[in-house]
Amino acid sequence: MYRPLIAVFFFLLLVFTVILVRSPKADLIVVGVIWTGETDRPFVEAMAIKGDRIMTIGFRDEVMSFSGKNTEIIELGKELVVPGFIDTHVHFLQGGLNLASVQLRDATTPEEFANRIAEFAKSVPPGTWILGGDWDHENWGGELPHRDWIDELTKDHPVFVTRLDGHMSLANSKALALAGVGNDVEDIDGGSIVRESDGRLTGIFKDNAERLIQMHIPEPSDYEVDMGLRLAMEYVASHGVTSVHDMNAMLDGMRRARSNGQQLTRYYGVYSLSRWEMVRDMVNREGNGDEW
């Protein structure tokens, strides 16, 4: 009677040993305060990761059993680990291109505003449009910028830099000339053009009026798209954002990033309702996408 039990015991021990020996080892083990999202166990001490999958979570000693000679271990102490954030409304390419352009968000005086544009102009070839900026005129008391601030500094570059909320932009005289916009231009519905008392344009265009200049700005090249998306992905990853819903879908650029092994962000491209037939045909042809 005892011999069969002993045989079964040693058989189970052998199986358990084989399982331990053959159990996959983690590529990465993270130790810290890890939030799980589970009501009955909201926090654990560690998690093991292999490839792009979480193998297990639990107490430190439990998870460390998945450690091998090539396992990287990150000790975070009391730092908090949470799932990646999802931003459901972004303009991803525009954000990335802005990161590559002149930075005006924290300019605190008209002089600093103008000098930053001038310095950036020196770094790009003549004729290059200077865009983005994300300026905030409230930083220097509320006076709107004027094209006279930058015209002498940007004679070789058309400039159309935008306020941080996107609702107004400043054009220099070269941009106005390329767009064929003069002092006699009429206001358009849903927008306004700021003028001096004698009717001379200051260079500020608001809301729908911005289109008078925007329609003359060249589309970004594939190189610029790829650079902008890369910068955007790196930036959001540095802030814990792992998925985005892009209001201006750039699927071709993201496909290139994917094929080159450079995609860092899960991506959902959003199209306007007016393009539903194009989206339908694309889904019928290519499917709904994959996990990325």
Which ranges hold each PLM region?
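Positively charged n-region of N-terminal signal peptides that target proteins for export
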Residues: 1-4
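Divalent metal-binding segments
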Residues: 23-31, 35, 39-284, 290
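Hydrophobic membrane-insertion alpha-helices, especially the h-region
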Residues: 6-18
